[in-house]
């Protein structure tokens, strides 16, 4: 069994960071690849929601999604929030896995405790379990941003998902930040001056 871990929302200016972990065997992973699984950024939103449902409802797939709010990111830092979320996933799911793969190049020092942990750059393109985790993290972020968009339509979050697009930055300059913005990001980039 392999545990794959990935995140969504790391570079967003607004909303939460979501980190997901998925554990399953290689046969199940292959079944998901046959369903069209790949890096969530390369899937349509409808396909992501379809795959999310299949992942969450599969008897032989175990998963965990951790949410870190904008407030937590502002008070603790993005890096600390990422590490805490990954630790929480490892505590819950690592006993089920022989191999642990994290997307990216940072193990947050956790490979000292988990000797079977590997970081894989572009892992969501190479390891099915990471791609499955990518789907769960991204659909969680998508859902949050659609809910927030209903409250603050002017920022275009239904399209930009909270990333720093031209329209989003112009809306911050014109309307100011919302309570859901990561104020540490906005201050760093002088959006309030």
Swiss-Prot record:
Keywords: Cytoplasm, Endonuclease, Hydrolase, Manganese, Metal-binding, Nuclease. GO terms for biological process: DNA replication, removal of RNA primer; mismatch repair. InterPro entries: RNase_HII, RNase_HII/HIII, RNase_HII/HIII_dom, RNaseH-like_sf, RNaseH_sf. Its EC number is 3.1.26.4. Its cofactor is Mn(2+); Mg(2+). It holds the Pfam family RNase_HII. It catalyses: Endonucleolytic cleavage to 5'-phosphomonoester. One of its GO terms (molecular function) is manganese ion binding. Belongs to the RNase HII family. This is Ribonuclease HII. It comes from Helicobacter acinonychis (strain Sheeba).
């Amino acid at each position: 069994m392999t545990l794959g871990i990935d995140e969504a929302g790391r570079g967003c200016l607004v909303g939460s960071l979501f980190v997901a972990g998925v554990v399953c065997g290689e046969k199940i992973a292959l079944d998901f690849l046959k369903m069209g699984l790949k890096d969530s950024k390369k899937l349509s939103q409808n396909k992501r929601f379809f795959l999310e449902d299949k992942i969450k409802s599969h008897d032989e797939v175990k998963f965990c999604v951790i949410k870190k709010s904008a407030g937590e990111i502002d008070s603790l830092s993005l890096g600390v929030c990422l590490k805490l979320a990954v630790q929480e996933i490892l505590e819950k799911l690592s006993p089920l896995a022989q191999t642990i793969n994290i997307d990216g190049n940072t193990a947050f020092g956790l490979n000292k405790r988990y000797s079977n942990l590997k970081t894989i750059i572009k892992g969501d393109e190479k390891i099915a379990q990471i791609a499955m985790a990518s789907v769960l993290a991204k659909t969680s972020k998508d859902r949050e941003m659609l809910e927030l968009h209903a409250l603050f339509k002017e920022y275009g979050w239904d399209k930009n998902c909270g990333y720093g697009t031209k329209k989003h930055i112009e809306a911050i300059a014109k309307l100011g930040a919302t309570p859901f913005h990561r104020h540490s990001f906005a201050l760093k980039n002088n959006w309030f001056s």
